[in-house]
């Protein structure tokens, strides 16, 4: 069984077990995979539309009015700060040099452009992940709190989270786990429309399921599901 070792911001560790089976269950049983990851894909990778905002709100239970995005001038044919972000950049796979000298700064500019009044780190990264699924880590509050990421400033929060997800994914054992998970999803044919979650998204989903199960074990649907499947708790 493939495990993911998580080192949090305070130095403590956690282990997420049975990652292959849990991600397969996520892709087949969690509506957000279809409604967000699959249906929310953009036609133009540099053009955020109401479709992405609606997909986020519907699937991830976010409340971010389309009008707010329109008022901030974000729903335009080509957002320059987004255009500067290569669609092939991969948060986990890129070298430290490329991340530090080229990508991190451009990602910060994109976050500064998007995260305005009434668009925080959570909703901002959820929409931007659809535009750059290999690069943008989702700053969901459950995951942010689980890892212990500071939340005072939206841009800083999103960038720190990206660094934490990158560190988790670049661990040698975790990299092996992520490769096994992707291979399992492809082999098991559990994904839709050839949308196999990126390494970044796999980490996000596993962290979210783990954190949600720890936070509300008596209410978390995944906690019951794992028991039924004979897997380790979230």
Show which residues each predicted segment covers.
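Short hydrophobic alpha-helical segments that form membrane-spanning helices or hydrophobic packing faces
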Residues: 123-130
